[in-house]
From Swiss-Prot:
<dbReference type="InterPro" id="IPR016181">
    <property type="entry name" value="Acyl_CoA_acyltransferase"/>
</dbReference>
<dbReference type="GO" id="GO:0015940">
    <property type="term" value="P:pantothenate biosynthetic process"/>
</dbReference>
<protein>
    <recommendedName>
        <fullName>PanD regulatory factor</fullName>
    </recommendedName>
</protein>
<dbReference type="InterPro" id="IPR000182">
    <property type="entry name" value="GNAT_dom"/>
</dbReference>
<dbReference type="InterPro" id="IPR040448">
    <property type="entry name" value="PanZ_GNAT"/>
</dbReference>
<keyword id="KW-0566">Pantothenate biosynthesis</keyword>
<feature type="domain" description="N-acetyltransferase">
    <location>
        <begin position="1"/>
        <end position="127"/>
    </location>
</feature>
<dbReference type="GO" id="GO:0031638">
    <property type="term" value="P:zymogen activation"/>
</dbReference>
<comment type="function">
    <text>Controls both the activation and catalytic activity of PanD in a coenzyme A (CoA)-dependent fashion. Binding of CoA or a derivative to PanM leads to interaction with PanD, which promotes the processing and activation of pro-PanD, and subsequent substrate-mediated inhibition of the active form of PanD. Lacks acetyltransferase activity.</text>
</comment>
<feature type="binding site">
    <location>
        <begin position="72"/>
        <end position="79"/>
    </location>
    <ligand>
        <name>CoA</name>
    </ligand>
</feature>
<comment type="similarity">
    <text>Belongs to the PanZ/PanM family.</text>
</comment>
<dbReference type="InterPro" id="IPR032900">
    <property type="entry name" value="PanZ"/>
</dbReference>
<dbReference type="Pfam" id="PF12568">
    <property type="entry name" value="PanZ"/>
</dbReference>
<dbReference type="GO" id="GO:0016747">
    <property type="term" value="F:acyltransferase activity, transferring groups other than amino-acyl groups"/>
</dbReference>
<comment type="subunit">
    <text>Interacts with PanD in the presence of CoA. Monomer.</text>
</comment>
<feature type="binding site">
    <location>
        <begin position="66"/>
        <end position="68"/>
    </location>
    <ligand>
        <name>CoA</name>
    </ligand>
</feature>
């Protein structure tokens, strides 16, 4: 099976289980989506391996809660996920990722830099 990045508009029972493993701090009811607030996920073998929340406002986009399940980290899932989010939103010219909740800032800084983001005092920016 191929790794697929998709925008989640509805959550299956399995999606809810997988999102609970990705984001144990969020309840299913807090994961509402619309045109401004989106969730993108990486799916492999019908299971979600990673996800990111996206908030859009005109030409600005904010990423938060980017997380890949521990067992599948360091295999390019997060990079592919962010690249596809950016590609899926061509009208967004400025992206922001806050460092709130980042588990290891040095690892995340290297990851974001590899994606073309520049470090700011409280996160990363890509224009």
């Amino acid at each position: 099976m191929k790794l697929t990045i998709l925008r989640l508009e509805h959550f299956s029972a399995q999606d809810q289980i997988d999102l609970g493993k990705i984001w144990p701090e969020y309840s299913a009811s807090s994961l509402s989506v619309d045109e401004t607030h989106r969730i993108y996920a990486a799916r492999f073998n019908e299971r979600l391996l990673g996800a990111v929340r996206v908030t859009l406002s005109g030409t600005q986009g904010a990423l938060d809660s980017l997380r890949v399940r521990e067992i599948t980290r360091r295999r390019g899932v997060g990079q592919y996920l962010v690249e596809e989010v950016i590609r899926d939103n061509p009208n967004v010219s400025s992206w922001w990722m806050a460092d709130v909740g980042v588990e290891d800032r040095s690892v995340m800084a290297a990851f974001m830099q590899a994606l073309g983001f520049t470090a700011q005092h409280d996160g990363w920016e890509k224009r």
